[in-house]
Amino acid sequence: MDSKYNHYEIEKDKNQKWIDKKYFINHDLDKKPFSIILPPPNVTGQLHLGHALNGYLQDSVIRYKKLEGYDVLFLPAMDHAGIATQIKVEESLAKENLLKQDIGREKFLKFSYQWKDKYANIIKSQWNKLGLALDYSSERFTLDQDSKDTVNKVFIDLYNAGIIYQGVKGINWDPLQKTALSNVEVINKETPQKMYYIKYFLENSDEFVEIATVRTETLYSDRAIGINPNDLRAKNYVNKFVIHPLTKKRLPIITDDYIDQSFASGFMKISAHSLADIDILNKNNLEIVESIDESGFLTNICDEFEGMERFEAREKIAQKLQKENLISRVENYSSNIGYSDRTKVPIEILVKKQWFVKMDLFSKMVLDSLESKNKVNFYPSRFKKNLEGWMNKTYDWTISRQLWWGHQIPAWYKDEQTKVQLNSPGPDWTQDPDVLDTWFSSAIAPFSFFGWPNTYKKLKRYYPTSLLVTGHDIIFFWVSRMYFSGLYFMKDKPFNDVLLHGLIRDEQRRKMTKSLGNGIDPMVLIDQYGSDSLRWFLITNTTPGLDITYNEEKIKSSWNFMNKLWNIARFINLQENTKKVSMSKYDYWISDKFNKVESYVKKFMKKYEFTLIGKEIYKFIINDFSSWYLEFSKITKNIDFQKVIFKRLLLLLHPFIPFLTDHLFKIIYDQELLEHTFENKKLKTQKNNVDQLILVIRAIREFREKYQISKKEKIKYWIQDCQFLQEDIDAINFLTFSELSQNSENMTIVENIKIFMILPKNIEENLSKEKAQKIEFLKFEIKRAQSLLLNEKFISKAPTLKVEEEKAKLEKYQLQLKELLDEKIIE
């Protein structure tokens, strides 16, 4: 073995070896199955640190289950990521001065698949660098032909069941990408704005009602003024009209319970760009006319503002109203504004014909399942309540997207007819140009990735999957939708357990984003420290559901831990077998410690408590195995047993440190680690006194450290009522460079063991001088404080706080003097 740990040399070919040997591709059908689907990363770029954390957590579970004797399937997949990928491809085309409309749909899709192929290859190389135990023979892509077949079947089946429908509704609209969005694709952000208080004069009157709005660009779509029917003023205004400040049209004053009496004047303008407003307009049979188009520009109903960008128009319209004295006041105002999760621009509410999924049935199915015996287990459990809260208030899911990259909707149109089927009904029928929301295909991943409906072999064996590991930020995007899709189509939950991890934040606790420029490339870290070091840092610093703070110093510490393991392995490997040695008390002691850590790991793995696993493993290796057992082994030299326990330790460590453990297993034992499983039997133990021995050794070492006694000078000690055997005394002497003597005079007590030790004369003399000086100083300070406190002038004139300070000093000095005068033992 090399003298120094070299992560690059150790890791560079390991994953390819595992692939070549098909350790995670060949499946033993006689074993109990355990399956995980890797959450498909988007083919929009390279993996980030969050992907690394997610992959490491799953991979550690897969490797642990394999070593437990399961038939494991870790299925790799990638997501076509509709909006995100189309944005990237359009940006790439723009560099060549091309628009997607210039090249047409077919060529655009060809470019998109080329993009996908490029980044899929990059992602696969990164998976290999991470060391993920994936079954590449089962790899899937959410836009491969099998996925297309499944998506079409699911859409058609849900349409025929009346669950998917087409309707005209107010929907979330991304004006930059020009596509509909579902509610979970909209991020609400607190945004500073201006609140304009606009005068709407009553018809044929100098009286006006004051309307507060930040969105002057929507004024041209106003079709009524509303007031709450419980407002005492309502009876005086209902059935009256106001004159619109811009168009001069008559607008009726109507009532609706939605209107907040406490907001501003209590009057509200009813326009076409709010879901609540649209609902009120529909209830009152009022027309819906939009003032903002699909691109975020004002429409032809907006007079001189037609064609103006919406936010520019907001300012210009406000200026016009102010010029005409139609604004009574302007205030700074902050409120939540919806932004597109992908393009980061403020959304619009537009009335569009779109495809929707009815959510009432699916919500009930999930809620019922969560209360059943066959429910999904959430780690941490609090996220079950989060999901319940979401399912109780969910809206119908908008699933159509005005994109080209994705699953084209299997709906066909001719004149006023609509048919939903796979193939064209005949001549002159046109397919819907829209595609489905990316999450539609992701929602059916747990069964579509296993071949449904074309084949059932894998589905029967591996569905429901054993575990889903994902970020808590997509529980509504993805987890909820997989849940109801599985319940509806498979009549069973899609996974047994869900482990939700947090985000990785920078050292200032900020989310890592491109805009902040604080993202960390995991591949750079792997080059610098190794995949094992990065894995150990990430998984042992993650608690289910909580965010992680990135800390490069901890990654360096992880590398040092790997280096420690390397040095331990070198120590064991370099020793030569001599004669056979029987088990010593130290062997039994470390066996007991190992049995306990093995049990801890098993216990914590059941709840995915990786931080606790890391603490127990680290404590065993650093404190028990390295600091004590290997020291004791220099006395007993039971090399055979050292290799027995180290072999079991490497197996236990493998899920969390796969590259290094695999390498060491091959070097020391000339065997492949992944061709082994955990031992079922515990290591044999016997009652022993090694823990007491350690206490004595530590006490003598601390005595040497405290008084800075040279390591070349023997410490003389004596143990009162000594129960230790001569072999124990020999071990103490060897490991502390000391000798048993009855002339010791200073005593320390550890767990009722009285240990007497003598100080070398030169040190004792120095300590005596220091002690005398301290006593003299304390006596002087005590005398000074007493004199001051007996002085009546000081007591009467000095501030109370000063007097109390002197009393406290006197008490402290008296106590310190007593301790010094009584000092005859070493604590």
UniProtKB/Swiss-Prot annotation:
Subcellular compartments? Cytoplasm
SUPFAM superfamilies referenced in this protein's UniProt entry, alphabetically: Anticodon-binding domain of a subclass of class I aminoacyl-tRNA synthetases (SSF47323), Nucleotidylyl transferase (SSF52374), tRNA-binding arm (SSF46589), ValRS/IleRS/LeuRS editing domain (SSF50677)
* GO terms under biological process: valyl-tRNA aminoacylation
**What family name appears in the similarity comment?**
Belongs to the class-I aminoacyl-tRNA synthetase family. ValS type 1 subfamily.
What HAMAP family would the database entry show?
Answer: Val_tRNA_synth_type1
Going by the UniProt record, its keywords in alphabetical order are: Aminoacyl-tRNA synthetase, ATP-binding, Coiled coil, Cytoplasm, Ligase, Nucleotide-binding, Protein biosynthesis
Positions of short motif 'HIGH' region: 41-51
One annotated GO molecular function: valine-tRNA ligase activity
Highest taxon in the source lineage: Bacteria
- Sites binding ATP sit at K514
Q: Which Pfam families match?
A: Anticodon_1 (PF08264), tRNA-synt_1 (PF00133)
- Return the broad EC class: ligase
**Functional description taken from the UniProt entry:** Catalyzes the attachment of valine to tRNA(Val). As ValRS can inadvertently accommodate and process structurally similar amino acids such as threonine, to avoid such errors, it has a 'posttransfer' editing activity that hydrolyzes mischarged Thr-tRNA(Val) in a tRNA-dependent manner.
The free-text domain remark for this protein reads: ValRS has two distinct active sites: one for aminoacylation and one for editing. The misactivated threonine is translocated from the active site to the editing site. The C-terminal coiled-coil domain is crucial for aminoacylation activity.
Q: What is this protein called?
A: Valine--tRNA ligase
In the Enzyme Commission scheme, what number(s) does this protein have? Answer: 6.1.1.9
The lineage is: Bacteria, Bacillati, Mycoplasmatota, Mycoplasmoidales, Metamycoplasmataceae
Please state the gene responsible for encoding this protein: valS
Q: Name one GO cellular component term.
A: cytosol
Ranges in a coiled coil: 765-827
Q: Catalysed reaction(s)?
A: tRNA(Val) + L-valine + ATP = L-valyl-tRNA(Val) + AMP + diphosphate
Describe the protein's quaternary organization and the partners it interacts with: Monomer.
